[in-house]
Amino acid sequence: MAAIIIRGSDIAQEIREDLKKEAAWLKAYGVVPGLVTILVGQDPASMSYVTAKQKTACKLGFYSLQDSQPGHVSESLLLDRIARYNKDPRIHGILVQLPLPPHIDEQKILYAIDPGKDVDGFHPYNVGKLMIGQADFLPCTPAGIQQLLIRSGIQTDGAEVVVVGRSNIVGKPIANMLLQKQKGANATVTVCHTGTRDVGVHTRRADILIVAAGKPKAITADMVKEGAVVIDVGVNRVGVTSDGKAKLCGDVDFEPVREKAGAITPVPGGVGPMTITMLMVNTLKAARLSAGL
């Protein structure tokens, strides 16, 4: 029997409807959530992501600003822009679209953002709070994954969770989040990475398998336990469709795994819409905290 499809696009829409109401409530107090997205260069994927974020913010009634800089922009100028937005009362969330050009120290840029406006959750202050289960802003993709699990009624308490990938953006934070003794967590978590000798040994015992490997179809059906929940974080461009659009696939070999899993997220339409939605959740929360509401 084929797996249940967990459609992140549907769950994201539910959350966005709630956000619209909360934004209207804040507006009654004279507060409009404000988000600035800083884009360096003209990478097509980054430009597409930034456009999607801006459109979503506008639909929710947020104040949205895009600060586009050329690829040769200096690190010092970028730091000056961030310092300006740190002080701007209209801006509650600052997002720097990654990756940055090689001549810019990514860490230095992210660390310059006011932790109270760090809606990506990458500042060391917010990472530290995440580690002890007290984060104000959860990293957007891991937060989206957790909400997918909670809102799909998937039991994490006591579950064997295997995360494939140890990036600072997805793998490490989702592992830490699911370890916490909290709702939507309290799992036994294993993290696989490039140093793992036999990934399949671990993935085959996972009740919940979260894949963020950055490699197309890295997880095949023989690596998945019967009835497992599979969350595919990967987005890989593997060609072009007949109408000229990018052809995408995840890190999971979807069709064969779908026949074995109990539930699975598609690519696109799975984790992606949740990432943008959780960015909006964080921006609204930052606005509320800033106003003391």
From Swiss-Prot:
A Gene Ontology term for the protein's cellular component: cytosol
Do you know which PROSITE patterns this protein is assigned to?
A: THF_DHG_CYH_2
Q: Which UniProt keywords apply?
A: Amino-acid biosynthesis, Histidine biosynthesis, Hydrolase, Methionine biosynthesis, Multifunctional enzyme, NADP, One-carbon metabolism, Oxidoreductase, Purine biosynthesis
Which reactions fall under this protein's catalytic activity? Answer: (6R)-5,10-methylene-5,6,7,8-tetrahydrofolate + NADP(+) = (6R)-5,10-methenyltetrahydrofolate + NADPH; (6R)-5,10-methenyltetrahydrofolate + H2O = (6R)-10-formyltetrahydrofolate + H(+)
E.C. number(s) listed in UniProt: 1.5.1.5, 3.5.4.9
Q: Which family does it belong to?
A: Belongs to the tetrahydrofolate dehydrogenase/cyclohydrolase family.
Its recorded name reads Bifunctional protein FolD
Q: Which organism is it from?
A: Syntrophus aciditrophicus (strain SB)
Gene name? folD
